[in-house]
């Protein structure tokens, strides 16, 4: 029997943040229409990738339950003190069996179902290291969405070095590498919940 094919893209759900603007609750476990936000995202992200990872620094057992239908693996930051999404990215890069990692926050229930395919096409066409989503509104205003990205896992050592140096800004680290921006016209697809008010607004959209 031939060996199973190696996965080409890992999906990484970023659920390891503090959620300071939501009283420190675990955002991915908050309910939208009776379903945890993280599960909404997993249902959209997992079909687009070959393996699924969940970056969670709290409630690992609960995330394991949510991720079980997708054979998701639960990972935690290598660095302490909740240093931000870059730490989750690093953990995902280290854990991935695939050479590419597609990431998404855990609180974006309307994630585009063609996100990964479009990021991959741009990454390959431009021979880039990173492909990042950018929304464009009706007034042609561009808004980068740095936590919706496709990255080469070969960048892990550089990212680890920058984190060790105290860098925490996602876009500043992206700027060190060839990054291609991929336009998305549906702003709704990237709506998230950074506050209780925004979570309530998601339910009305």
UniProtKB/Swiss-Prot annotation:
InterPro entries from the UniProt entry: MobA-like_NTP_Trfase, Molybde_CF_guanTrfase, Nucleotide-diphossugar_trans
EC number(s) per entry: 2.7.7.77
Keyword check for Lyase: no
Catalytic reaction(s) noted: Mo-molybdopterin + GTP + H(+) = Mo-molybdopterin guanine dinucleotide + diphosphate
Cell compartment(s), UniProt: Cytoplasm
Coiled-coil region(s): none
Nucleotide-binding recorded as keyword: yes
Molecular functions per Gene Ontology: GTP binding; metal ion binding; molybdenum cofactor guanylyltransferase activity
GO cellular component entries: cytoplasm
GO biological process: bis(molybdopterin guanine dinucleotide)molybdenum biosynthetic process
Residue sites binding GTP per the record: 14-16, 27, 77, 107
Binding residue positions for Mg(2+): 107
Co-factor(s): Mg(2+)
Highest taxon listed in the record's lineage: Bacteria
Keywords (A to Z) from UniProt: Cytoplasm, GTP-binding, Magnesium, Metal-binding, Molybdenum cofactor biosynthesis, Nucleotide-binding, Transferase
Domain notes: The N-terminal domain determines nucleotide recognition and specific binding, while the C-terminal domain determines the specific binding to the target protein.
Assembly mode: Monomer.
Family from the record: Belongs to the MobA family.
Protein name: Molybdenum cofactor guanylyltransferase
The species this protein was found in: Burkholderia orbicola (strain MC0-3)
Gene name of this polypeptide: mobA
């Amino acid at each position: 029997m031939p060996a199973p094919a190696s996965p080409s893209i890992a999906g990484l759900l970023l659920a390891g943040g503090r959620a300071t603007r939501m009283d420190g609750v675990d955002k991915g476990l908050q309910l939208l229409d009776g379903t945890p936000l993280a599960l909404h995202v997993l249902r959209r992200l997992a079909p687009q990738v070959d393996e699924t990872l969940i970056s969670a620094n709290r409630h690992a057992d609960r995330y394991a339950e949510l991720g079980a239908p997708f054979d998701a693996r639960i990972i935690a930051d290598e660095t302490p003190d909740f240093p931000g999404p870059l730490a989750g990215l690093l953990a995902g890069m280290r854990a991935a069996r695939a050479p590419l990692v597609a990431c998404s926050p855990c609180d974006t229930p309307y994630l585009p179902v063609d996100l990964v395919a479009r990021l991959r096409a741009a990454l390959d066409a431009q021979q880039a290291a990173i492909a990042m989503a950018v929304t464009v509104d009706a007034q042609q205003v561009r808004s980068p969405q740095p936590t919706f990205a496709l990255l080469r896992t070969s960048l892990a050592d550089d990212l680890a070095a920058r984190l060790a140096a105290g860098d925490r800004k996602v876009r500043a680290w992206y700027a060190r590498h060839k990054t291609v921006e991929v336009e998305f016209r549906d702003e709704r697809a990237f709506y998230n919940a950074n506050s209780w008010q925004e979570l309530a607004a998601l339910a009305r959209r």
